[in-house]
């Protein structure tokens, strides 16, 4: 259960001096409107918490799709180069690890590391798995699903009987 910790009411007006998201996963990636005017969101209600709407490419959050034909993982790794990434399959799991050592950027020095693990569906063909990194930093891990002929879709004809059913009426 997530519990929002609020500053006392007399400190909410001093919001700029008491930042609410000092160290979050978007540290160093720019400011939101709520960072510039935090007192507007905190005076509405003590339980109001503004959600962060970001596009999929900017969120750092993965998306997993498992449909009838394939299994796909999309993961934003824009801060990592292919040499910084390791993707491996261990049993029924795929593990994606990214790490780059401390390096200098516009704001000082930064290092990043993440580790994600996803369960592979049992129907995925593990011999045909693939992984690619797009120019905009989106890692795509995919694999086709094995189609079992006994579980394939087939139409069942509906026949009409002339006599009434013997099902009990309610």
Swiss-Prot record:
Subcellular location: Cytoplasm; Nucleus
GO cellular component: cytoplasm; nucleus
Residue numbers carrying Deamidated asparagine: 101
Positions of region (Disordered): 144-170
Glycosylated residues in this chain: 159
Pfam families: Crystallin (PF00525), HSP20 (PF00011)
Modified residue annotations for Deamidated glutamine: 6, 50
Domain of life assignment: Eukaryota
N-acetylmethionine PTM positions: 1
Modified residues (N6-acetyllysine): 70, 99
Principal cellular location given in the protein's record: cytoplasm
BP GO terms, sorted: lens development in camera-type eye; negative regulation of apoptotic process; protein refolding; response to heat
Sequence segments annotated as region (Required for complex formation with BFSP1 and BFSP2): 1-63
Phosphoserine: residues carrying this PTM: 45
Chain sites annotated for binding Zn(2+) 2: 107
Purpose: Contributes to the transparency and refractive index of the lens. Acts as a chaperone, preventing aggregation of various proteins under a wide range of stress conditions. Required for the correct formation of lens intermediate filaments as part of a complex composed of BFSP1, BFSP2 and CRYAA.
Family: Belongs to the small heat shock protein (HSP20) family.
Subunit structure: Heteromer composed of three CRYAA and one CRYAB subunits. Inter-subunit bridging via zinc ions enhances stability, which is crucial as there is no protein turn over in the lens. Can also form homodimers and homotetramers (dimers of dimers) which serve as the building blocks of homooligomers. Within homooligomers, the zinc-binding motif is created from residues of 3 different molecules. His-100 and Glu-102 from one molecule are ligands of the zinc ion, and His-107 and His-151 residues from additional molecules complete the site with tetrahedral coordination geometry.
The name this protein goes by in its record: Alpha-crystallin A chain
Annotated source species: Bradypus variegatus
Gene from which the chain derives: CRYAA
């Amino acid at each position: 259960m997530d519990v929002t910790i609020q500053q006392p009411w007399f400190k909410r007006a001093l919001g700029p001096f008491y930042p609410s998201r000092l160290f979050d996963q978007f540290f160093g990636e720019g400011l939101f409107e709520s960072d510039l005017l935090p007192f507007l969101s905190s005076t509405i209600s003590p339980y109001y918490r503004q959600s962060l709407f970001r596009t999929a490419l900017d969120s750092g959050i993965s998306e997993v799709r498992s449909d009838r034909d394939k299994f796909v993982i999309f993961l934003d790794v824009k801060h990592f180069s292919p040499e910084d990434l390791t993707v491996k399959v261990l049993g029924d799991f795929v593990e994606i690890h990214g790490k780059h050592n401390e390096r200098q950027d516009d704001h000082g020095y930064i290092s990043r590391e993440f580790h994600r693990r996803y369960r592979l569906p049992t129907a995925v063909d593990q011999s045909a798995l693939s992984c690619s990194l797009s120019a905009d930093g989106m890692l795509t891990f995919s694999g086709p699903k094995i189609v079992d002929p006994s579980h394939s879709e087939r139409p069942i004809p509906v026949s009409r009987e002339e006599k009434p059913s013997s099902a009990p009426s309610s």
